[in-house]
Amino acid sequence: MFDQLDIVEERYEQLNELLSDPDVVNDSDKLRKYSKEQADLQKTVDVYRNYKAKKEELADIEEMLSETDDKEEVEMLKEESSGIKAELPNLEEELKILLIPKDPNDDKDVIVEIRAAAGGDEAAIFAGDLMRMYSKYAESQGFKTEIVEASESDHGGYKEISFSVSGNGAYSKLKFENGAHRVQRVPETESGGRIHTSTATVAVLPEVEDVEIEIRNEDLKIDTYRSSGAGGQHVNTTDSAVRITHLPTGVIATSSEKSQIQNREKAMKVLKARLYDMKVQEEQQKYASQRKSAVGTGDRSERIRTYNYPQSRVTDHRIGLTLQKLGQIMEGHLEEIIDALTLSEQTDKLKELNNGEL
């Protein structure tokens, strides 16, 4: 571990020198690239330097203890030594976590897609509930949300809806939401009071830069049409909605807000995210055949969570977490679930780094 930390610190110093180089300062791409790399290493270097300083301080105390017979001084030095010895294991654990390879998508904005699955109208209503839950969570984190495309249900909620979430670390917070979400409750239209089970699927796609995926203009088919709302009524009187089809894969992205220019930009953003996601999913499927992590495979069909309304209970099946806080969670208070999933992922990766042993 300490060899790795020495390499990280050395690279950090190299970046300091590079960021002082006039050639780099005058090259905006290099400046942005090196500045981001340095920022990513900053926390690790700070903690490692603090750790080394504590080790040196401890060595100095041990040396002073060997040179003094003064009882009062010995007692004081031993107290200082005990305090530092108690700190070191915590710093070591923090360094282990900081050395875990970071998901390259963690800092990115995301496209969230929610689709009503089994359960008819109730599934669509639940899809709307999930949309509201994520919107409230995003707001609490200082993220910005914007609807890209929505197909409303006649009885409330959405048949499907996609929206962007923008803000530093959006993907790191929402990536665990991939999968099938199940709700158990009595629908408002149910006169007999029977509990129904419905599902909605959630896909969280990191937004990608042009350099990460190449899309040729000749591979695109772009159509415009009039957007419609619930019940099929036309929302716009002009052909402002946009549908973009990627011909080689058949992947389609649409956006149906009021501005055709904005719709084209939004649809392209979604198309890039979906094509990138296809590529990532293929790689993950190969990897998942060798190993299944504690937080699941990320498969969209995998049931990840159940929301039980009669018992006010939410259960995340990947880590066996059950919380009797359904009301709070549906109001966007997802921190406890997301923190637990993040910790589970970190523990899993630490096991890998330690060859299966913590």
From Swiss-Prot:
Q: Where in the cell is it found?
A: Cytoplasm
Tell whether Transmembrane helix is among the UniProt keywords.
Answer: no
Grouped into one coarse class, the protein's main location is cytoplasm
TM spans (from-to): none
Q: Which Gene3D superfamilies match?
A: 3.30.160.20, 3.30.70.1660, 6.10.140.1950
Modification after translation, per record: Methylated by PrmC. Methylation increases the termination efficiency of RF1.
Where does the record place the modification N5-methylglutamine?
Q233
For this UniProt entry, the molecular function terms from Gene Ontology, in alphabetical order, are: translation release factor activity, codon specific
**InterPro entries xref list:** PCRF, Pep_chain_release_fac_I, Pep_chain_release_fac_I_sf, Prokaryotic/Mito_RF, RF-1
Q: One Pfam family this chain carries? A: PCRF
Query: Coiled coil: which residue ranges?
Result: none
List the GO terms this entry assigns under cellular component, sorted alphabetically: cytoplasm
Keywords, A to Z, come to:
Cytoplasm, Methylation, Protein biosynthesis
Q: What family does the entry list?
A: Belongs to the prokaryotic/mitochondrial release factor family.
HAMAP family named in the record:
Rel_fac_1
Function, in words:
Peptide chain release factor 1 directs the termination of translation in response to the peptide chain termination codons UAG and UAA.
Task: Indicate what this protein is called per its UniProt record.
Answer: Peptide chain release factor 1
